[in-house]
Every structure is written in structure tokens, then in C-alpha cells.
Design a protein with these regions (language model features):
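Short alpha-helical hairpin
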Residues: 2-19, 63-68
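Active-site flanking loop/helix segments enriched in acidic
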Residues: 12-36, 70-81
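Alpha-helical phosphate/pyrophosphate-handling elements in metalloenzyme active cores
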Residues: 27-60
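Divalent metal-dependent catalytic cores for phosphoryl transfer on phosphate-bearing substrates
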Residues: 50-218
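Short helix-capping/linker segments at secondary-structure and domain boundaries
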Residues: 216-227
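Conserved small/polar residues in nucleotide/adenosyl-binding loops
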Residues: 240-247
Length: 251
């Protein structure tokens, strides 16, 4: 298996994202999130006993999983796929297709890894990382890499939410967030110990329930251990203003 040059991949990622406005807190958030997901994938793969080559590949898949977010924010000023397009599909376009003529930067998968031997696996790990469920027809190896990226993404989203404002994440001010209530489908997902589907989130507060539900569907034991060790899942629901509010009272 061809070795992956992490320095080359980091440099390619930085070169691409430097063209976007890192003073925008939402761009900065996604850059930081990307690095954290890559490291989470590395940590989980190591703890699960993967080979050194597969650890590197898991790290790279984590680094590339959100490549579509930067164009999504530039074109539509939102992270909501329903109000723009699938950021996963956009990431595939950026890495494996043609970049738009007005994009501030262009890149290609070959900027990150010389060989094309892993292209289909990398493509799948990006394409399916935010899907509610993985396709049934995936082969076992591809599913393993998709699972580790999805786990790494969930783990760091917990940190991201805890460290960010609701305006940065949802483009909703705090008053509107606190005025919202949990919707019935979201609470049903919580009671069923499963993730919340996008079309089940009807209120800003539902995003918080969805975050907590991530813990139910982490695949790897090492992912669950890492999430518990980091403790980020507890921080959003420990805020004083949430504890005093109906939203916090339910949790």
C-alpha cells in the first residue's frame, strides 16, 4: 500500500482554505473542525489496532470529509444542506470534479495523495459521511472507513457546538434558540436511542437533542471512549441559561 504524505495533504488543505475568509468565524470553525476530525480518525484507528497504512488513510479521509463546506458557505452563506446543496456532494465535486470558474481556489484529490488506488474509498467516505444511514451495498472495508469518519465527525461536532455560539452554528440568535422547544419527532429519536434525521429537526433546540443522540450511534468502542474522555457531550446541557429553561429541564 502506498504511504500517505501527511505534510503534503496538510499543505494542500491549507493552500485551498487560505483562499477563503478565515476571519469569518464559520470558515474558521470548519478549518479547525477538519483538523480535529482527522486527528479523531487517527486516534480511533490506532486504538482499534488498524495497520499504520490504514491509520494514515483514515486520517486523510477525516481531513477531506468536509471539503464542500467552504464553497457551500461562499455560495449560499449557510451550512444547511436543505437551503443549499449536499455539502458531501459538493466535496466530491471539489476533489473529483471541476471547480467553478469563480471559486477563489481550486484543488483536486491528486493534490492530497499521489496514487489513485484509494480514490473510490475516499470518495465514499466523503459522500456518505453525513447520510442518515450508510448504503447497504458497501463492502466491509469501505464501510469501516465510512464508519470511522462518521464517528470522528460526530465526536468533534460535540466539541464544536460546546465551543461556539448558536449564531455561528445555526445563524440563530440566542434568544430565538432559547425560545424554541423540542419537537415531538426529535424527542422520539432520543427515546429510541438513535440519531435524529434532518427532516425531524423542526426547532433550533432540536439541534441540541441531535447532538446528544450522536452518542447512541458511535460505531467503534474507541470512538465512544474518546467521546467520554473529551466530555464535550456534557457541556452544552450544563449552561446555566439552559438549566433554568424548559429546554434544559427536559435534558
Amino acid at each position: 500500500m502506498t504511504a500517505i504524505d501527511r505534510d503534503r495533504a496538510r499543505a494542500a488543505f491549507k493552500s485551498y482554505t487560505d483562499a477563503y475568509d478565515a476571519t469569518n468565524p464559520r470558515i474558521a470553525l470548519k478549518i479547525e473542525h477538519t483538523y480535529h476530525v482527522a486527528e479523531a480518525c487517527d486516534a480511533v484507528a490506532r486504538e482499534q489496532g488498524w495497520s499504520s497504512e490504514d491509520i494514515d488513510l483514515a486520517w486523510l479521509c477525516g481531513l477531506l470529509h468536509d471539503m464542500g463546506r467552504f464553497e457551500q458557505l461562499r455560495r449560499w452563506d449557510t451550512f444547511k444542506d436543505a437551503e443549499s446543496m449536499s455539502h458531501a456532494a459538493l466535496g466530491i465535486e471539489v476533489l473529483f470534479g471541476e471547480n467553478p470558474a469563480d471559486a477563489p481556489a481550486t484543488t483536486n484529490i491528486r493534490d492530497f495523495i499521489e496514487t489513485g488506488a484509494h480514490d473510490e474509498l475516499i470518495r465514499a467516505s466523503i459522500a456518505y459521511h453525513s447520510d442518515f444511514r450508510l448504503p447497504a451495498q458497501l463492502d466491509e472495508r469501505t464501510r469501516c472507513f465510512c464508519d470511522i469518519v462518521r464517528d470522528g465527525d460526530k465526536i468533534d461536532i460535540m466539541r464544536t457546538i460546546a465551543d461556539s455560539t448558536v449564531d455561528t452554528i445555526l445563524k440563530v440568535d440566542e434568544d430565538a434558540f432559547l425560545a424554541s422547544r423540542f419537537s415531538v419527532p426529535t424527542l422520539a429519536a432520543f427515546d429510541e436511542h438513535r440519531c435524529v434525521a434532518r427532516d425531524e429537526r423542526n426547532e433550533p433546540a432540536d439541534y441540541l437533542v441531535g447532538l446528544i443522540c450522536f452518542m447512541f450511534e458511535l460505531v467503534y468502542p474507541a470512538s465512544r471512549a474518546l467521546a467520554r474522555e473529551q466530555g464535550d457531550i456534557h457541556r452544552p446541557v450544563s449552561y446555566t441559561h439552559l438549566r433554568a429553561h424548559e429546554t434544559g429541564a427536559y435534558l
